[in-house]
Amino acid sequence: MTKYRAKPLYYCHQAQKFIESKQVKQLSKLEQKSLTYFASRHEFDVYKVLFETSLRSKIELQPKVEIIPPKVTICYPNGKYWKADFMTRIDSKPTMLIEAKGVITKDFMLILSLLELNNQELFNKLWLIFPNSIPQNLLIKRLQQTTMKEKVLTLKQFRKKILTMTTR
């Protein structure tokens, strides 16, 4: 599943610059290994906020999250997994599950439902980060009526909250 109308990009930490997908093929295999893939610019911006804090060494990119456990359904006997954007861990325990969203798609609504149903602990650690404004749909309104209301944020709000959390 890809981002809704997003343009993927690669970031070279060493050169501190973006590299377009078509340029990556021209690089050597060694140079390609030093790149970090981001499905959208917004995803990179969220990563950058995390990277600039004390959470830097605790960030896991594209963690595989179980949304249907194995051997529970006929359709998914091996289970079903979703690759979130980021997870932070302390002592190997997940502390934050972060998804950079531009648009809430029907696929994502289904993923959220399955996560809530089958992995409540991780669902409660979920943060949804939007670029400039938080969409006003039924799903978001419901989330904002729960304890998740403080974890459905714009990028600017997220930056402020993370800096406050990590400088205590």
Summary of predicted features, one role per range:
Residues 1-168:
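Electrostatic, structured charged patches in enzyme active sites and in nucleic-acid/phosphate-binding
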